[in-house]
């Protein structure tokens, strides 16, 4: 099948890695458990608001030597700025989720950190090997790069864990 052909291409050096990227965890878990993958990309499940990939996927990937890329770290915008983009999973966020995101934002602001910077760094802290973000402008790219070196105190991470 297709996976056999991909493995052959990898062995021949035609491709360097075999990867699968999905937003739904169930099929991604199955691929991670059964397929000869090098890397997986999860979307929106290793975030400050949704940590299901941490619970269900990271250990399995590590045990099989599979790298993890986190995408969708803003959960459709709410973790970039809850008031400017109150969306979660491409829909209007409900009041409880919006309030939770605002609490996270306030915790960050109290310590001089943007919520977006914490959202981008969170998956790396939890075991992801890389993060994918989308930028619309060069200024957004610059902000993401600057955020990677922003000082985020350990005390903030601890507060975000329980928020």
Language model regions located:
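Beta/alpha (TIM)-barrel catalytic core signal, keyed to glycine-rich beta->alpha loops juxtaposed to Asp/Glu
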Residues: 1-162
